Structure formats: structure tokens, C-alpha cells
């Protein structure tokens, strides 16, 4: 429509004048060109509108800068941007060029340059910039008129022709410089001339500093662009190398293909050029471009700031001298006024004296003298003020001269700095483009050579070679005999037969030319031998023949075999649920063409991750839950045919779960779940999260700086945690960053309800950390001491702490110990690369200390003492990492598996509350060969053959009792019923073994180390000891064994079978006679004092002594029973792990006939019976100090028959009766079935009476019967 109006107006002007003028002719010519080229081009109109809109925005920005900030630099920048936009518009649209428009731009530039910004304030702002605003409006009006005339077709070339040549070549960017700043033509200036030009400007320093700052920003942008470009090119080269390697391996196995050598050379050229480009990128990132330019930029910034500070100091000094000059000037004026007043007063006094009488002459003379004196003083002050003013003027002049000199020096320094920076920028720019040119030149030459080689190829040449090779009789015999497989001759309706696999395709012998696999489909009716029939099928799949996308193909997978193309009936659609295990088992096995990851079917155009390529997907028909995002998958979802994994199509790009080729397990809650739930599913008890993360970090991040300290991406960390819960072992974590993997590992350890080091061992490990701190302080104090070299006390302390830590760690369950061992070993490998990753054992201790050892969570407020324990936690982990090779022996502890008689696996209870399983004699020799230095042991235990065999027979019984006592702590009644039922079954089978042990002629010999020369004090007793039992226990002897066994199961203490060396001992008066007996591989008496407090608050159970005699007494039976509650006098020491034969002896004694027993010979128990009763929770420790003696009860004599058992007697001062399975009532053993009372306080233990000790020694020598 606009073009129609233009033509109509043009015709009216032409015919109205009668003859067309030159201007009209020119207008017509311009209009024709515009109409033909631009008016009918909508893209041109759109571009013109955008340019005009940009110009209007630049005008508004300039006006807003003037109104808001009034900063000179900002306004000049906006003006330069406006002129630059105007220049670009005129260069694009030549018809808009005009003298009026350029004149308006020059006027605007001149007005802006003429403004003195130092005089601008809020009051006179509008007056000063009035002319500038009018110039802006003039420029906008002129541009609008020219644009309107252009659109209406009234623009002629006369306005362009009137432009002088010098004006046409002038740039709008140089208008301000040419019209205002430069008095002469533009040209090259010497450095001195540049400095002189800047010295004439009052703001020369500010301009130079502003240019330096702009140069720094400009350089920063250039460096950022180059770095980003190089990173993209580096990533691209890596992908190109992978693609070239994969393609090369694919086409290398194919034979008789056209231009194969040419494409192989092209791939090699790509690989070579990619390697060269990587070297070029590394050089540019190092010393060829980035580093020199960044160094020069930093130097520029540093010197610019120093120069700016120096210039401000000089300006402040000049300002101070000018202020002092103004004050001196005001003082001079004030002194001058005072002098004038004094002088006029003196003049009036003289006149009064002349006109006065003689009588008043004396008084007037005095006044005259006084005023004359004041006048002289005022004159003197005037002279002093003048002198001070002159000095100030001199100082101002000196400061101004100094400022000028400083200004000249600063300008020279800035000019030199800018030239140096430009020189560096020039050098690195030359390096950049020269290296890129060399890279492009080599690539161009290789491409040219490949182009020339491709022109020489004769079409069909390779096919002819292929036919010649297949027609040879010798080749046919070799193929039929060695390579090709028999093919069926059954007819196919489609004309194709399915090939087996890539291995089924025939290979030609090496004597022929290099054979390549055929990529084109041959004719279906080709006839010939079996070798030819193997090639007659389709050589590529449907997706390849139709130009399908190969984006979803893995770069590492092999190419599709020639027999992959065949037809097949569609499979039955999926039911869409995760429970379709029957469908998974019943469906037909996949064909060779569909077995590979490339057979994606309808999903070949979907972007997939490396893990997604391992699956074999099909369409999902019903809604279910996505394994990647945990969202509901509607109909646009996919399901794996093998593992039944379901996810959205859009989630295939980020899927990290690999196909396990079997049904995928359900989601397992790992983070925040109980440790035993995850550990029991692993054979070694180490959670798979710990193993996966640690192995991945060791593979690629041991040298990464800040490993475990730098945080990862929160979103990616949460996604990895979700993937581990969904896929467990099948998660591919190679796509995640190392810091994300570290965050996942730390998060798992932090969210454990109970850390690896259990809550019950927290205090012992904290005490150990304090000892470590004490040893470190001593080591620092004695480091420079010469006596320390002669007496290495520190090394002994370190060894003592090492052995103590080993003993403490043995108290951990097997899964906790193995997991801690694995983690500490991994952290040790991280510390080995501390020079690269900057993470030593101290840093790792600070990070992992609060996660590996922490107190039981409470609601108490955080105090300073609790905060101080963080350092102890970090110090302990640092110690474990530093001495990991000495603390951990390198072998993992085996997992304990509980199996019932029926063959079913028993429910696994919390291993944290169970003692360690007993070790075999071989294991005791290897694991406990070293004695802790803080023990006072003197001898080692030598176990006899009888002990080892009896240990093997009674292991299952000990294990059952240990499990039962540990489960006795549980409060849930249902669990108690189930567990007791299971252990009753185990006890029945175990009792039979115990009878065999009792009947065994071999003895269980325990050696005493009471004497220092390792000689036994007494010979082994050949007769049975008398029996001391309560009444109710004696009545049970006549009952059936099953009734007794059901009751005896509850009386077994788990601690006597434990491997825990931390036991509480009695404080004896006579330390010289203390016995140190060792049973089952560890010392009973060697207990450190810091460990004694662990079991002080526990409750204890009163036990009785049972001694089976070897003869049948004929006397009556008398039994004394008493109630003995826990008090210091009867406080039992912890009984160590006893031999397995002890239990068997007690069980066998119960099953034998009754015999005569006598009254107890030690302290009487408080309880009415020997069975354990839980203490009243309301009683206090102080109340337990009372002791009540009960009368004895006479019982009819009962005979107890038992086989003779020879027992080696230990010292009576030992902590337990080792030869028989019972202990005296004065030594009740602590019970592990009841938890420790928190309100109970540790009490002192009453020392044993010396008289009672002597009496027991006498009984050892001479048996006494009642």
C-alpha cells in the first residue's frame, strides 16, 4: 500500500511540471531502487524498524544520564554509544545519509563537550544543559524528517551529492574529537605530544585512569571469550576423537567397501587434528594467550590504583595549602581593618588635644600615648599577616608546581603502562590467530588431499573385487570348510532369511585383499554357494536404510551385524506394572538383532544416557512410578523388557540405573536407615554406598584439590541419593562430579542413626583421644630435648595407645568394624596424595570426626564442654588415619550368621550389643599375640588339645546363649517369644553336645600364672569337689532335663562368652598375690583403670557355687541361702570369658543324680533364690549397703551322681572359678541382661577377707565334705 501511494504521488509531480527535472529524475531512480530492493522486502522493513527503535533508545538513555547522574564519564559513554548506533544505521541504509543529520550530530557533540561539569549543581542544571537538550531534540527531529522522506520516496541523491568528500569519510565516532578536542587534523603523535595534549586538559589524569580501567574490563571480556571458546573446542575435540575411534573400529571389520581406506585416513586425520588442537588449546591456556594477558591486566589494575591514590594525595595537599592561603588572606584583611580603626582613633585624639584647654592637656597626652601604642601594635600585626600571606602564596605555588610535575609523571607512567599492555595484547593476539591459522592450514591441506583422492575412485571397483573373490574355487573351499555355517533352504515369504549374529558372517582368508563388511543390501535372488548366501541378506537395519538418526547409539558399541535386518512379529505389549515377573520369564528369548543396545526400535530418536542404552525398552501401557524422578508415568513412558525398569521418555537422557538383566528390586531406604539393615545384605558387612563412592573417588579424584572439603551441587547430590535408593549397585555414578559423590558419602555417614563407633563406646574413645592429645603435647615439649633421644617415652606411649585402640575397635560388631576399616583405608589413600589434593589427615579428621563418633543425641542444650569434644573427635579420626596400617591388620572380620535347626536363618539382632564370637586357637595366636602395654601380664596362655576340641563342640551352644542374652534386652514381648522359641530348639541340640563333652575322657586344662616361674601351685585335682546349692536348685536335680534346661537358658550370661577384654576387677588389699589368669586367648586381670567405669553402674546377679564330688557321701545335706543385693561389699567383678567346657560341666552336673552338698563357704547371697531378679528401680545405691543374713534351711540328703572330671584349679583370688562352671556366692557375676541405671553412682568394692582367702586355699588342698 505504501508503494502504491509513492507511485501515485510521483506521477502527479511529473505530469504537473510538463517535463521531469533532474531532481525528480534522481528521485525516481532512487525510489525505483528502494522500491525494488527494500520497499517490497518485509525483512528489510523489520530491520529498519529495529534500528530506528535502537536509535530512539540511545537518545533517551543520553537524556536520562544527563538528568540523573550528571557524571562526565557516563554522559560521554552514552554519547559515544549514540554516535556509534547512528553510524551503523547510516552504513546499513545509505539513503538516510544527509548533511543536516551529520551537522546535528556535530552540534550535539560540541554542546556536550562544552559543558563544565565542575560547576553543575541541582540549581543550575537545567540552565547549563538547556542547549544540550535542544541539540538532542534537533537531532531527533532531523532524523525523523529524513526517515519520513525516505519512506515516502522524497529522498533524493542531491543531499548526498552535496556532502564534501572529507565529510563523507569522517566517522561519527571521531566527531567529538575532530570538532572540539583536536585543533588540527588527525594524525600520529609522538609520546611527548600525547602527554602535552593531555596536560592541557584539566581532567587529563581522570581521563587516563578511566581509559586504563576500561582497558582492564575490555581485556577481561576478551580473556573470558577465549577461555570459553577453548573449553568448548576442547570438549568438542574429545567427542570427535571418541566418535572417530568408534567409527574406525566399526568400519575396520567391514570388507569390500568403497573408499574405505579414504575414510579411514579421514578418521585418522580427525584424530590427529584433534590431538593437535588439544595441544594448541593447552598452549593458549598456558603461556601463549591467557596467562600473559591476565598477568598484564592484574598489573594494570594494581598500578592504576596506586596512581589514583597518589593523585588524590597530591590534590589533598594542594587543597590544604589553598585553604591556608584563604585563611591568611582573611587574616590580613582583618588586621588591616584593625589598623585603620587604631589610626583613626589616634587622629581623633590628636585633634582633641589641640582643641582642649591647658588643664586637660595631661590627661589627653596619656590617651594619645596609649592610642599611638595601639596603632603601632596594629601595624605590626598587619605586617605579620602580610608575611604569613606571602608564605601561603609561596606554598600554594610550590604545591601547584608539584602537582603539575606529578601530573606529568603520572601521565607518562600511564602512557608507558598502556603501551606495554597494548604490546602484550598484540603479542598474544598474534599467537592466537597464528596458531589457529596453522591448525586450519593443516586441516585444509589434509582435506584437499582427501578430496583429490576421492576423485580418483572408480565406482563399482570394490564390488568387482568382491565378486572376483567370491567366485574363486579355492576361496569357496576355504569358506565352506572353515568359515561359513550351513544355511537353511526353507523359503521365506519376504525373500529374506534371518542371520544369526556377527560371528556367523563369513570371513575371507588373509591371502586375498583386505575384506570389509558390506554395508549395502544385495539382491535377494542372488545365487551361489553358501558363502554368497550368507551375504545376500539386508546389510543394514530399517533405521539406517531410511536415514534414521544415530544419536542414541553408543560410541563404544560394535556396529550392527549384516544379518540384523529381518522381519519379526510384534511382541505382546507390557502390562505396565513392576510385578510382571512371569511375563519376564515366559517371553521368548531376544533375537541377535535385538540383543544389542542399538536395537532401540521406536526410541531410536530419543536422547539417552549411557545407562539407558543398556536397557531394552518397550512402550508402557498403564500408569506406574518412574524410577528416575519418582513421578507418576502416564502413557508416554517406557519399560525395560529385562529388568522391568519404568521411566518417562524425557528421563531417559538423565537415567543412571544400568540394566541388571533381571527384575529390579524395589526402592530401599538407605539414607537415615539403620546401619544393620544395609550391612546385612552385603557379604562383608560394608554398605554398597560406601564401596561405590570410595572406589569412584579413588579412580578419578584422589588428586582433586579440596576433595571432601568443597561442596557439590545440591540438586545433583539429591538426585544421586535417590538413584542409589532406587538402583543400589546398578547406579552409574561416572556422570556425576567428584564433589557430588563426596557429598553423598558424607551425607550417608551423617544420617546414620548410630555411627560406626557405637554410642556405648563413645566415652572410651573420647578418653583415648584425650590421651592422644596428652601424648602429642609431651612429644612437642620433648621434641628438642636431648634426653628424649636417650629415653623414648613418647614412642612407648604411642604404642600403648595403638594397642588400646585395637582392643577398643575389637569390641565393635563385625559389620561396623569392617565398614570403619574400609573407610579409614580409603581416607588413608586420600592422605597419600595430600600434596595434590591439599587434604591431610588433620583436615579429614575435622570433616569425618563428628560423623564417625558422636554422643547419644539428647535434648540437653549445647554447652561449651560439648563443643570442645569436636576437637577430640577430629583428633581421634586423625589418629586412626595416620596409624591405620598398624591399627587395622588388613583382614576383615567375618559376618556372624545365625541358623536354626530347621535350616532357616534366624532374625539377626543388633550386633552392637552382642559380644565378639570366640576365636579358634590359631586365630588367638595371631590376633592376640601382642599384649597391651597398659596391661601387667606376665605369661601367655597355652591351650591344650582338649581345650581346642571342647571349644569346637560347644561353639554352637555358646553362640545360642550369647544371642539369647543379647535379645533379652529387648522390651518387645512378641520378639521375645519368637526368639526364645528358636533358642529352645537350639538348646535341645546343644545339650546333647554338652553331655558328650562331659563324657569325654579328655580334660580341659587351664594353666595358672600365679607363680613367676610358671610352675603350677597344686597338682590337678583327681576327685570331684562337694556341691553347694540352694534348696530349690537341689529339688530341680530330680526333675527332667527338659524342665531344667528351659529354666537354665535364662541364667546364662552373655558376657562370659564374649571376647570383650574390658572387664571390671576387684581392688584387692594384697596386690602381690593377685592372680593373672588367661582364658580363651586374653588376660582376665589386665584391665586398665579407665575401662573399669564402663560396667560400674550395671546390675549384678547373685550366683551360687556348684562343686561335683567324685564320691557318694553318706551324710545329710544342709544349705544356707540368703538375700544379697548389690552393695559395695558384695559387688561382683566382671567375669571374663570362660572356657566352653565350663558350661558343659554345669549342664552335665544338672543331669546327674544328686549327691551330698554342704553349706556355702563364702559370702552369703542376698536373694532367696539363685535366679536373677531385676532390681527395684526406686532403690538407691546407698541403701544397698545394708546386708541381711537369713537362717539356713535343712534339706534331706540327695545323692548327685556325676562322672569324674579332673580340673586344674586356679588361684582362689582369680576373678572367676575357671575349672568349674560356677562361682562363689560372694562373687556374683554382672548381668548383661539389664541396662545400666543412670542414677546409680560407682561404689567402692569391699576387699576380700584374708581369712576367707586362706580358708579357700586350705580347701583346695584338702577336700571337705558335709
Swiss-Prot record:
F-BAR domain residues: 192-462
Residues the record lists as Phosphoserine modifications: 171, 176, 179, 190, 501, 521, 554, 920, 956, 1028, 1149, 1151
Membrane-spanning intervals of the chain: none
Ranges for domain Rho-GAP: 673-888
Region (Disordered): 482-501, 542-601, 1039-1081, 1116-1157, 1209-1266
Span list, region Interaction with PTPN13/PTPL1: 1263-1266
The name this protein goes by in its record: Rho GTPase-activating protein 29
Amino acid at each position: 500500500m505504501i508503494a502504491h501511494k509513492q507511485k501515485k504521488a510521483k506521477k502527479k509531480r511529473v505530469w504537473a511540471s510538463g517535463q521531469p527535472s533532474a531532481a525528480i529524475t534522481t528521485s525516481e531512480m532512487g525510489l525505483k531502487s528502494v522500491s525494488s530492493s527494500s520497499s517490497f522486502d518485509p525483512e528489510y522493513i523489520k530491520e529498519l524498524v529495529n534500528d530506528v527503535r535502537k536509535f530512539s533508545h540511545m537518545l533517551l538513555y543520553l537524556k536520562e544520564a544527563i538528568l540523573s547522574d550528571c557524571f562526565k564519564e557516563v554522559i560521554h559513554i552514552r554519547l559515544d554509544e549514540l554516535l556509534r548506533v547512528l553510524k551503523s544505521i547510516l552504513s546499513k541504509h545509505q539513503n538516510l545519509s544527509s548533511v543536516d543529520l551529520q551537522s546535528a550530530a556535530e552540534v550535539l557533540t560540541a554542546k556536550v563537550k562544552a559543558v563544565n561539569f565542575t560547576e553543575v549543581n541541582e540549581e543550575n542544571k537545567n540552565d547549563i544543559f538547556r542547549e544540550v537538550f535542544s541539540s538532542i531534540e534537533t537531532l531527533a527531529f532531523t532524523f525523523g524528517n529524513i526517515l519520513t522522506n525516505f519512506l515516502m520516496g522524497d529522498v533524493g541523491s542531491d543531499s548526498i551529492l552535496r556532502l564534501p568528500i572529507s565529510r563523507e569519510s569522517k566517522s561519527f565516532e571521531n566527531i567529538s574529537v575532530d570538532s572540539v578536542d583536536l585543533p588540527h587534523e588527525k594524525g600520529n603523535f609522538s609520546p611527548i605530544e600525547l602527554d602535552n595534549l593531555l596536560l592541557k586538559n584539566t581532567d587529563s589524569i581522570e581521563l587516563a585512569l578511566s581509559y586504563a580501567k576500561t582497558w582492564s574490563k575490555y581485556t577481561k571480556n576478551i580473556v573470558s571469550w577465549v577461555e570459553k571458546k577453548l573449553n568448548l573446542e576442547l570438549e568438542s575435540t574429545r567427542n570427535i576423537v571418541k566418535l572417530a575411534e568408534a567409527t574406525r573400529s566399526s568400519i575396520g571389520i567391514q570388507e569390500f567397501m568403497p573408499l574405505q581406506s579414504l575414510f579411514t585416513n579421514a578418521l585418522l586425520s580427525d584424530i590427529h587434528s584433534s590431538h593437535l588442537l588439544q595441544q594448541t588449546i593447552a598452549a593458549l591456556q598456558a603461556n601463549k594467550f591467557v596467562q600473559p594477558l591476565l598477568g598484564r591486566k592484574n598489573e594494570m589494575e594494581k598500578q592504576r590504583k596506586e596512581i589514583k591514590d597518589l593523585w588524590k594525595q597530591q590534590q589533598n595537599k594542594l587543597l590544604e595549602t589553598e585553604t591556608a592561603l584563604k585563611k591568611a588572606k582573611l587574616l590580613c584583611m582583618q588586621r588591616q581593618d584593625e589598623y585603620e580603626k587604631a589610626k583613626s582613633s589616634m587622629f581623633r585624639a590628636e585633634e582633641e588635644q589641640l582643641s582642649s584647654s591647658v588643664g586637660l592637656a595631661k590627661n589627653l597626652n596619656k590617651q594619645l600615648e596609649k592610642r599611638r601604642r595601639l596603632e603601632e601594635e596594629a601595624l605590626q600585626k598587619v605586617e605579620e599577616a602580610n608575611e604569613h600571606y606571602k608564605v601561603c602564596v609561596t606554598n600554594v605555588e610550590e604545591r601547584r608546581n608539584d602537582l603539575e610535575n606529578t601530573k606529568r609523571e603520572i601521565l607518562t607512567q600511564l602512557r608507558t603502562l598502556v603501551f606495554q599492555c597494548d604490546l602484550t595484547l598484540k603479542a598474544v593476539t598474534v599467537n592466537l590467530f597464528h596458531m589457529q591459522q596453522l591448525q586450519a592450514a593443516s586441516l585444509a591441506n589434509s582435506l584437499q588431499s582427501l578430496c583429490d583422492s576421492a576423485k580418483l575412485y572408480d565406482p563399482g571397483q570394490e564390488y568387482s573385487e568382491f565378486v572376483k573373490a567370491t567366485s574363486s574355487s579355492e576361496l569357496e573351499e576355504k569358506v565352506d570348510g572353515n568359515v561359513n555355517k550351513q544355511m537353511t533352504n526353507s523359503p521365506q515369504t519376504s525373500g529374506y532369511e534371518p542371520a544369526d549374529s556377527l560371528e556367523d558372517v563369513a570371513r575371507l582368508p588373509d591371502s586375498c585383499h583386505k575384506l570389509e563388511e558390506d554395508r549395502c543390501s544385495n539382491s535377494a535372488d542372488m545365487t551361489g554357494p553358501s558363502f554368497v548366501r550368507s551375504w545376500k541378506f539386508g546389510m543394514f537395519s530399517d533405521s539406517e536404510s531410511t536415514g534414521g538418526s544415530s544419536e542414541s547409539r553408543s560410541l563404544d558399541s560394535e556396529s550392527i551385524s549384516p544379518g540384523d535386518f529381518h522381519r519379526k512379529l510384534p511382541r505382546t505389549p507390557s502390562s505396565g506394572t513392576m510385578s510382571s515377573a512371569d511375563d519376564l520369564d515366559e517371553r521368548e528369548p531376544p533375537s541377535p538383532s535385538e540383543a544389542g543396545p542399538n536395537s532401540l526400535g521406536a526410541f531410536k530418536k530419543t536422547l539417552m544416557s549411557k545407562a539407558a542404552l543398556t536397557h531394552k525398552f518397550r512402550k508402557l501401557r498403564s500408569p506406574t512410578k518412574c524410577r528416575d524422578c519418582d513421578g507418576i508415568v502416564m502413557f508416554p513412558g517406557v519399560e525395560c523388557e529385562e529388568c522391568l525398569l519404568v521411566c518417562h521418555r524425557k528421563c531417559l537422557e538423565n537415567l543412571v540405573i544400568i540394566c541388571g538383566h533381571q527384575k529390579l528390586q524395589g526402592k530401599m531406604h538407605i539414607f537415615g536407615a539403620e546401619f544393620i539393615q544395609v550391612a546385612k545384605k552385603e557379604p562383608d558387612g560394608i554398605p554398597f554406598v560406601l564401596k561405590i563412592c570410595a572406589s569412584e573417588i579413588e579412580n578419578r579424584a584422589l588428586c582433586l584439590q579440596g576433595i571432601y572439603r568443597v561442596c557439590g551441587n545440591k540438586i545433583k547430590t539429591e538426585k544421586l541419593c535417590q538413584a542409589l535408593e532406587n538402583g543400589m549397585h546398578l547406579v552409574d555414578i561416572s556422570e556425576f562430579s567428584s564433589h557430588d559423590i563426596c557429598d553423598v558419602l558424607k551425607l550417608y555417614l551423617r544420617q546414620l542413626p548410630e555411627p560406626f563407633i557405637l554410642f556405648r563406646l563413645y566415652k572410651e574413645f573420647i578418653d583415648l583421644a584425650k590421651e592422644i592429645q596428652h601424648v602429642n603435647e609431651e612429644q612437642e615439649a620433648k621434641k628438642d630435648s636431648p634426653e628424649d633421644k636417650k629415653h623414648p617415652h613418647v614412642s612407648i606411649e604411642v604404642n600403648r595407645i595403638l594397642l588400646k585402640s585395637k582392643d577398643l575397635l575389637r569390641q565393635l560388631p563385625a559389620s561396623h568394624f569392617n565398614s570403619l576399616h574400609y573407610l579409614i583405608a580409603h581416607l588413608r589413600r586420600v592422605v597419600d596424595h595430600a600434596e595434590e589434593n591439599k587434604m591431610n589427615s588433620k583436615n579429614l579428621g575435622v570433616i569425618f570426626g563428628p560423623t564417625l563418633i558422636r554422643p547419644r543425641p539428647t535434648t540437653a542444650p549445647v554447652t561449651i564442654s560439648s563443643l570442645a569434644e569436636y576437637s577430640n573427635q577430629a583428633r581421634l579420626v586423625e589418629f586412626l588415619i595416620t596409624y591405620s596400617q598398624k591399627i587395622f591388620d588388613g583382614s576383615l572380620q567375618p559376618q556372624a550368621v545365625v541358623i536354626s535347626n530347621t535350616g532357616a536363618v534366624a532374625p539377626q539382632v543388633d550386633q552392637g550389643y552382642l559380644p565378639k564370637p570366640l576365636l579358634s586357637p590359631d586365630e588367638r595366636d595371631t590376633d592376640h599375640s601382642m599384649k597391651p602395654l597398659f596391661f601387667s601380664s606376665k605369661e601367655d596362655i597355652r591351650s591344650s588339645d582338649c581345650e581346642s576340641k571342647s571349644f569346637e563342640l560347644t561353639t554352637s551352644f555358646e553362640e545360642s546363649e550369647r544371642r539369647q542374652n543379647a535379645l533379652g534386652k529387648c522390651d518387645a514381648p512378641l520378639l521375645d517369644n519368637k526368639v526364645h522359641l528358636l533358642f529352645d530348639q537350639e538348646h535341645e541340640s546343644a545339650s546333647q553336645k554338652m553331655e558328650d563333652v562331659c563324657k569325654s575322657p579328655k580334660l580341659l586344662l587351664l594353666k595358672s600364672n600365679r607363680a613367676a616361674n610358671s610352675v603350677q601351685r597344686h597338682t590337678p585335682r583327681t576327685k570331684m569337689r562337694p556341691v553347694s546349692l540352694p534348696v530349690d536348685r537341689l529339688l530341680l536335680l530330680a526333675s527332667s532335663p527338659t524342665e531344667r534346661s528351659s529354666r537354665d537358658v535364662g541364667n546364662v550370661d552373655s558376657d562370659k562368652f564374649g571376647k570383650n577384654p574390658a572387664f571390671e576387677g576387684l581392688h584387692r588389699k594384697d596386690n602381690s598375690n593377685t592372680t593373672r589368669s588367661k582364658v580363651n586367648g586374653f588376660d582376665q586381670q589386665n584391665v586398665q583403670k579407665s575401662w573399669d567405669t564402663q560396667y560400674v553402674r550395671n546390675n549384678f546377679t547373685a550366683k551360687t557355687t556348684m562343686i561335683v564330688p567324685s564320691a557318694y557321701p553318706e551324710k545329710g545335706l544342709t544349705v544356707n541361702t540368703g538375700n544379697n543385693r548389690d552393695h559395695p561389699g558384695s559387688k561382683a567383678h566382671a567375669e571374663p570369658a570362660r572356657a566352653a567346657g565350663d558350661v558343659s560341666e554345669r549342664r552335665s552336673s544338672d543331669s546327674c543324680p544328686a549327691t551330698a552338698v554342704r553349706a556355702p563357704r563364702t559370702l552369703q547371697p542376698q536373694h532367696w533364690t539363685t535366679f536373677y531378679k531385676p532390681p527395684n528401680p526406686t532403690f538407691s545405691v546407698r541403701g544397698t549397703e545394708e546386708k541381711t543374713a537369713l537362717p539356713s534351711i535343712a534339706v534331706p540328703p540327695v545323692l548327685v551322681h556325676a562322672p569324674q572330671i579332673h580340673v586344674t584349679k586356679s588361684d582362689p583370688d582369680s576373678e572367676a572359678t575357671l575349672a568349674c562352671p560356677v562361682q562363689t556366692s560372694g562373687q556374683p557375676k554382672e548381668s548383661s541382661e539389664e541396662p545400666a541405671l543412670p542414677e546409680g553412682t560407682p561404689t567402692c568394692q569391699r576387699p576380700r577377707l584374708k581369712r576367707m582367702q586362706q580358708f579357700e586355699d586350705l580347701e583346695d588342698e584338702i577336700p571337705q565334705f558335709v
